[in-house]
Amino acid sequence: KCVVLAREMTLSQIEAMAQALDGEIELESFIHGAVCMSYSGRCMLSSFLTGRSANRGGCAQSCRWKFGLTEEKRPGQVFPIEEDASGTYILSSRDLNAMPLLDEILAAGVTSLKIEGRMKTAYYVATVVNAYRMRLNGADEGLCMEELSAVSHRPYTTGFYRDEAKRAPNAPEGYERTREYLAPVVGRDGDRIVCEVKNKLQEGREVELLHPGRAPVRFVARDLRGEDGAPVSAAAEPGRRFTMPAPGEAGAGDYLRADI
């Protein structure tokens, strides 16, 4: 048996619950990803605007759309509430990142860690899961935190674990990331990896290879070849495949990315 904990529970509350249950029921806690702006996720915004119920796993994250305020006698005149160069985000929560508290969460009695995957790319899930797996295996926290900055995310918060969400709940800054996702590795052909273009890769660019359970490996992309085996200076057409030499045991399930 397993109980999925509400995201507004603090570390002290989780510890008290674990002690009361005395190991009879496992505890699962959400540790990374988008956080609902409504208490306990009881939000009807997505259901009202899109017909997709947040309470049935179908949230369209409508709270992250751009909103403005209008007065009924001034139709068409929009009043910004909290605006920057990217728009107004009055309902947007920061993203949860519990990496700094991971040891404390486990010590409190949590036995299952939940990471957001719905509405995210395979690259996002692979990067985040790999970062937490490395940390659980003893990797340096700084390295793992750097990995979490690589994916597209809103400014991070540790949420309600230490009540930080009450002090800085919103993220008007928008999304940020430090890496560009280039291609998934879909196979291997001798000493070359077979990749599928997601974003343009120019020959000579320094790239990183993301491999499960390991820190990323940097190398320079050289000797790119298209689907017909002919040399190309760049892999640029989304969906097309290309090959190139790669270090180590790179293969299907790995990802290529580069600094922005």
Task: Describe the residue ranges of each PLM region.
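Conserved thiamine diphosphate
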Residues: 1
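Active-site pocket-lining/capping segments in soluble small-molecule metabolic enzymes
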Residues: 4-5, 11-112, 119-260
